[in-house]
Amino acid sequence: CKEKIEVLRCGLRAAEYPHACKNPAVFFNPLRQKIYDTCVRTLELCMHDHYEDCPWREQAMYALDSRNQMLCGYFAFGEFAFARASLELMCNDKGIDGYMTICFPTNFALKIPSFSLYWFMQMREYTEYSGDVTLVEKYFDKMQALLELFLSRVENGLIPNFYGDKTFWNFYEWSDGLSGNIFSEEEKRFDLPLNCLLSIAMSNTDFVRRVLGKSERYAQEKAALNDRIDETFFDAKKGLYRDFTDSKHYSEFGNALAVLCGAARGERAKRVGELISAKSNDLVPASLSTASFVYDAVLNIDKNRYADFVLGDIDAKYGYMLQAGATSFWETLSGEKDFGGAGSLCHGWSAMPIYYYHLLEQVRG
């Protein structure tokens, strides 16, 4: 074209998943309304052909990330086809050693063992909320085989970390001491989060067994594991559970898992709840990815007592991001400054307020 061209506008046309958002939630509290709406937008931005952690960096589906996303999506969108398609992709993972790969799909050899255990949680929650048992019917043998693979590593009642192998990354969350060492042959030790997640995976597998008309299989093994967790990791002086056998490291996340798996019981659980919900507790704080486990733990201890704590904590953290100009929620509270300037400003695992608002807030409409 020889004539001059005048560019009137440059832009992007969104191509979004065509979900039907049923009865958008309306709240009396304007801050919570803004948080909820931004969480829903964050979820939408992380939905393409499957759930993805973020829309600009890896664009990959991880088990922990997608567990948070799926649970929130059940409430925000009231549909299950997208979650099922994502779970089918995970269920067809072909890890050469039987453990799930770091994300789906991939031919990358790296694995995060704890993430394999979140898959059991995802399968249970999908079944519970959708009422569809055909997915767990189809992949029950895979669930059983993967759980048995983890249990085959148990030594003296506990599972050690995945040591001496660079293809395993002992990652739990992006917080001090819990992010592991990628591409490293770590030394052997026993980790509280891994053992608690294994205990929870046994509960989730027995739930699926009951749904499928099978007898429970893991109740005794779970009880024995919980006893060993309590014996090994509990620090009576602090009234807390330490994260590792080789160090005095205490986190909100690890202690929350001790409550959720049933290792912390009775007065010990109550004390843990008081400490992990305290403003100044000297514990490694839970990140946005795992704060939900802290919320679940204290709500399991006493829902009436801790509901305001959960809602207030969400107000503070998510209100901070909104005040900083967020139009979608971040990977961590450090925003783009994290990871050497590569922090994600739109991360699906941070949409968890959706679930807690439906659980605890008064919703209109």
Q: What is each residue range found by the language model?
A:
Residues C1-K34:
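Extended acidic/polar, glycine-enriched regions
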Residues K2, E16-P18, D49, I96, ...:
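Short loop/turn segments at secondary-structure transitions that flank enzyme active sites
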Residues E3-I5, Y36, G95, S350:
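A generic structural signal for short, non-catalytic loop/turn and secondary-structure boundary residues
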Residues V7-L8, I35, Y51, K138:
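Short helix/loop capping segments that flank catalytic or ligand/cofactor-binding pockets
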Residues A25-A81, M90:
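Structured secondary-structure scaffolds
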Residues M61-F77, A81-G365:
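Active-site core of glycosidic bond-cleaving carbohydrate-active enzymes
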